[in-house]
Design a protein with these regions (language model features):
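Histidine-acidic metal/acid-base catalytic patches
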Residues: 4-111
């Protein structure tokens, strides 16, 4: 499922207590460009169902699984107080420990 309307149909069949969503930030970036929808409005719609957020950066064209960068659109989601207790999953490929430590500093400093 990639489009907001697909999730709206799903929510008609499942209660919040029966369904948890792992929001993949990289996939969200790709889908929002492919299907022309607002990332932040989409997250607001999913918010009650989000139990985890999978984190990676990409160029909006392909799923690159790059480390997070400063001052990007997704920090508003990551730092949303409603997600303070939601699991954050790092999904970086071919990333050295130095770069991972840098990303952790972003988290400490709220980016």
């Amino acid at each position: 499922m990639q489009r907001p309307e697909e999730y709206q149909k799903l929510f008609k069949y499942f209660d919040i207590k029966d369904l948890g969503i792992n929001l993949n930030i990289g996939h969200l970036n790709l889908a929002s460009k492919a299907f022309n929808f607002s990332k932040l409005k989409f997250v607001d719609m999913l918010k009650p169902y989000i139990t985890a957020i999978e984190l990676s950066h990409n160029n909006g064209i392909e799923d690159q699984h790059l480390p997070l960068k400063r001052n990007e659109w997704y920090w508003k989601i990551i730092n949303d107080p409603d997600f303070s207790k939601v699991y954050k999953i790092l999904e970086f490929r071919n990333t050295n420990i130095k770069k991972i430590k840098e990303v952790f500093k972003f988290f400490k400093n709220k980016q």
